[in-house]
Structures are given as C-alpha cells and as structure tokens.
Swiss-Prot record:
Keywords: Endoplasmic reticulum, Glycosyltransferase, Membrane, Transferase, Transmembrane, Transmembrane helix. Pathway: Protein modification; protein glycosylation. GO terms for molecular function: dolichyl pyrophosphate Man9GlcNAc2 alpha-1,3-glucosyltransferase activity. This is Probable dolichyl pyrophosphate Man9GlcNAc2 alpha-1,3-glucosyltransferase. Belongs to the ALG6/ALG8 glucosyltransferase family. The lineage of its organism: Eukaryota, Fungi, Dikarya, Ascomycota, Taphrinomycotina. It comes from Schizosaccharomyces pombe (strain 972 / ATCC 24843). The keyword Glycosyltransferase applies. InterPro entries: Glyco_trans_ALG6/ALG8. It is found in: Endoplasmic reticulum membrane. Probable dolichyl pyrophosphate Man9GlcNAc2 alpha-1,3-glucosyltransferase that operates in the biosynthetic pathway of dolichol-linked oligosaccharides, the glycan precursors employed in protein asparagine (N)-glycosylation. The assembly of dolichol-linked oligosaccharides begins on the cytosolic side of the endoplasmic reticulum membrane and finishes in its lumen. The sequential addition of sugars to dolichol pyrophosphate produces dolichol-linked oligosaccharides containing fourteen sugars, including two GlcNAcs, nine mannoses and three glucoses. One of its GO terms (cellular component) is endoplasmic reticulum membrane. PANTHER family: DOLICHYL GLYCOSYLTRANSFERASE, DOLICHYL PYROPHOSPHATE MAN9GLCNAC2 ALPHA-1,3-GLUCOSYLTRANSFERASE. The gene is alg6.
Length: 506
C-alpha cells in the first residue's frame, strides 16, 4: 500500500483529504452525497423498455407490480395478468412493490398506478418517483452492511485512507449501478439482505444471519446462488469445534419461522392452491436453460453444439444440476470443514460463480450475484487480489454491454467504467507472468470487441455475431475468475489445515 497518498490513485487522494482527526467525520456524508449524485446522473438516462411498446421492459414490470399489488387481493397476486408482466418474484418483492405503490398512489399521483389504464404509463414525474425508490433502497439496505464489512476488516487495513478507498470502489462498482439505476431493477435490496447476513456471520450472530438470508431468498429467488455456501458454513459452525445440536435446531426453526411469516397470507387462505402457484411463477423451468444471450457455459456451448436440439428440457435440467453441484462442491466442503470468517467471501464467490456458469435459467443480470462477494474482497487488504477483482468487475459490466446498449445507456456505460477504473487505478496486472498474460489478453479482447460492436455492423447473415463474441469472451473470463476464487480458497484452507495440525502436534 502507498504511504504517500498524494502520489496514489485519485480515490486515495480524495480520501486522504479527510484523514485528519477534525475532518474524518465529514468523510461518510461526502461519500454518500457522491454516491447519490452518481446514481442520479445515471438515472437521468433511459431505462429498460423506454418508449418501446407494446410490452416496454423491466421499468414497466416493476411499475405494474405496484399497480397489481395495490388493486388485487393478495390471493390473486400470482394469478392475475400473467401475460402482462405477471408477478414472478417471491412475496417480499410483492410486499415492497405494494409499499411503494401505496406511497405513489396516495401521496403523489394515482394515475401512475391506476388499475389497467396505467399500463405503459410514462412521465418524467413517474420516472423521478421510481428512480427515487431504487436510490432510497440502495442507501438504506445495501450501503450500511457494506460499510460494516469494510469497518470489520479494518483490523487488516488499519490505515484510514486505504480502507475507505477500497470501500469506495465497492460502492461504485459499475455493473450494479448501471443495472439498478440505469436499466432499472432492485437488485440492491436482495444483495443488501445477503450482505446483512454476511455481516451477522462476522459477528457470530447466526440466527440473525439466517433470518436476513431467508429474507433475501423471499425477495429474489436468485439468492439461491448463495444458499449452499451459507448452509454449509452454518452447518460447520454447528459441528466444529464441537457438536451444537441446539444451534442447529434454532437455525432450523428460524428458517421455518421466516418463510412462514412471509408466506402467511397464502398459507392462511388456501395453501394447497396458492403455494404451488407461487412456486410455479418463481421457478419457471419451462422458459428453458437460459434467456437471451448470457455468458454462461450452456449459452456459449450452444454456439458450436445445439444442446437444446439434442436434449429434452428435463434432461437439460438434470445435466445442469449435475454440473452445478460439481462446480460448487469444493467451496461448500471447505466452508463446512473450515467455517472461518476469512473464507466467507471467497466461499460465497466461488459457489455463486459456479451457479452462474452452470445452473438452469440464468439471466445476464445474474452476474451481479457472484460479483458482490468478489468485489468485497477488496476490503481484505490483499493487494495481490486487486488485478483479479478489477478484471471480474470489468468483465461483468462488459458482459452487460449488449443489454445496456439496447437500453440506450452507452454514455453512462463508458463514463462510469472509465471513471471507476481511473479513480481506483484498477487496470493493474499480477506479477506472475502467466497471470499477467491472461489478464492482459482479456482486456485487449474486451477493447477489440467493443470497438467492433461500436463501429462495424454485423454481417446480415449473422446479426448476433458481436453479441456471441461478447458472450464467449465473458464466459472464458468468468470461468477464469471462478478458477481463481476456487484456487485461492483451496490455498487459504490448506494453510488453515496445516496450522491446525501443527497446533495439535504442539
């Protein structure tokens, strides 16, 4: 780490202005204001489905769920308007949509969420309201646990400047900001609940961690990416260093209680009819192995081997399940054998990358899940990991380029990506010659493909050629990041094993 911050990265120079005792209290207000300012700059641009009837896009889906939950009995939430952005997220998302719908309807403009007639409604005022709900959710739910995580690891990075420079880079990661505040979604809520779970694991508050993770699952089903690692970590704490059966029972009761609480209206009314419909909507296996062009194994393989023409849907489900289990097994076993806090982020990252690369029904935006635990590794203070974390972030936002380009967010994309890499001096390379070559190759590949996409139209015979190139390079990069997280996890766990063995011998 640099000791003379004035010669360091711009983010270090910024933080160093607050390192005096009299100025430290100003740092976090300035950080929050800077984050909100950036979110609003992104929000000025268009969103998913802007002015594109008849179905519009994710913005209309989120608005419609507010309309639907506002005017429809709870028992019909998962039955109504299935052809017009029917509700396909778990109940906590529905509750949040209802809450925001109540605020918009009664305190601002009822036309925004009028039953049926508001479909496709677009106005500057509605856009301002919807954008505000995402920003508020981001600040209230995601930012606090990230700050706690950074502070908890401050014992590894006692220096005020280095510690908070890392926090800034995590808070300003381009992929999440562009998807939530540009494209328009509420991923920050689910990711924030996951971070609250991780924060409570750091505090040994296992019941609270279980509760928050169950909330994440009931907000977005994609939080399942983290279910195996957190399960095996918690299971490990129940049997090591000694068996704690009472803890296992308490955690099990917490899971049952949380899901029962969230699902209570449907359980109370008619669980035999309503719960199966919720499961059917939340897990739409009939949609296929993936949607659109996504940088995972199956979509990449499909460019040379048409797997959907060879295997049935059921066979693909089984095959993807086997591949996913194989990819997440090592990290889950390590977290079970060594439930240590220093392994949490790496274990979550490795398992969620495995899920993203090999699981069934993956969206391109799902890359935000493995990107979160990968990014928070910056807070651990190991400078040798920075090149890989930076590469993961740049690959993630690069893989989202076709979607963001479609949304008309090209200006926001390039501005934010260039700014993030510049302020954090993120385009750095490992000292290892092989690693340096791999990292440099991916950066060159991204620049070349972006240049081609911007200035050369694809052949009429292959209109998706540039997208396929993007998917192929991104998959190769993500698989490399997966191998890196797994390799690092194995390395640290082997050192832990050696240390434990030496203690026993002593």
């Amino acid at each position: 780490m640099l000791s003379e911050f004035e010669n360091g990265a711009p983010v270090q120079q910024f933080v160093s202005r607050f390192r005096s005792y009299s100025s430290k209290f100003l740092f976090f207000p300035c950080l929050i204001m800077s984050l909100v300012f950036m979110q609003w700059l992104i929000s000025i641009g268009p969103y998913s489905g802007y002015n594109t009837p008849p179905m519009y896009g994710d913005f209309e889906a989120q608005r419609h769920w507010m309309e639907l939950t506002l005017h429809t009995p709870v028992s019909q939430w998962y039955f109504r308007d299935l052809q017009w952005w029917g509700l396909d997220y778990p109940p906590l998302t529905a509750y949040v949509s209802w809450f925001f719908g109540i605020i918009g309807h009664y305190f601002f403009n009822p036309e925004w969420f009028a039953d049926v007639t508001s479909r496709g409604f677009e106005s500057l005022e509605l856009k301002l309201f919807m954008r505000s709900t995402v920003i508020a959710s981001h600040l209230l739910i995601l930012v606090p646990p990230l700050m706690f995580y950074s502070k908890w690891w401050s014992r590894r990075i006692p220096n005020f400047v280095d510690r908070n420079a890392s926090l800034i880079m995590v808070l300003f990661q381009p992929a999440l900001l562009l998807i939530d505040h540009g494209h328009f979604q509420y991923n920050c809520v689910m990711l924030g609940l996951v971070m609250y779970a991780i924060a409570n694991l750091l505090k040994n508050q296992y019941v609270a961690a279980t509760f928050f993770f169950c909330l994440a699952l009931t907000f977005k089903q994609m939080a399942l990416y983290f279910a195996p690692p957190i399960f095996f970590y918690l299971l490990g704490t129940c049997v090591k260093p000694k068996i704690r059966f009472s803890r296992f029972i308490l955690l099990s009761v917490t899971v049952v209680f949380t899901f029962s609480l969230i699902l209570f209206p449907w359980i109370y009314m008619d669980y035999k009819t309503l719960l199966p419909q919720i499961l059917h909507r939340v897990f739409p296996f009939a949609r296929g192995l993936w949607e659109d062009k996504v940088a995972n194994f199956w979509c990449t393989l499909n460019t040379v081997f048409k797997i959907r023409e060879v295997f049935t849907l059921h066979q693909l489900q089984v095959i993807s399940l086997i591949f996913t289990l194989i990819s997440i097994l090592p990290s889950c076993v390590i977290l079970f054998l060594y439930p240590r806090k220093r392994l949490l982020a790496l274990g979550f990252a490795s398992a969620s990358w495995g899920f993203f690369l090999f699981s069934f029904q993956v969206h391109e935006k799902s890359v935000l899940l493995p990107l979160l635990p990968t990014s928070i590794l910056l807070c651990h203070g190991n400078i040798t990991t920075k090149p890989w974390i930076a590469l993961a972030n740049n690959l993630a936002v690069f893989s989202l380029w076709p979607l963001l380009k479609k949304d008309g967010l090209g200006l926001q994309y390039f501005t934010l990506v260039l700014m993030w890499n510049w302020i954090g001096d993120m385009v750095v390379f490992s000292k290892n010659v092989l690693f340096r070559f791999i990292q440099l190759s991916f950066y060159v590949g991204m620049i070349v493909i972006l240049g081609i996409d911007l200035f050369i139209p694809p052949p009429s015979r292959y209109p998706d050629l540039w997208v396929i190139l993007n998917v192929t390079l991104s998959f190769a990069g993500f698989f490399t990041i997966y191998l890196w997280t797994l390799g690092r996890l194995l390395h640290i766990s082997s050192k832990l094993s050696t240390d434990l063995r030496n203690k026993k011998e002593a």
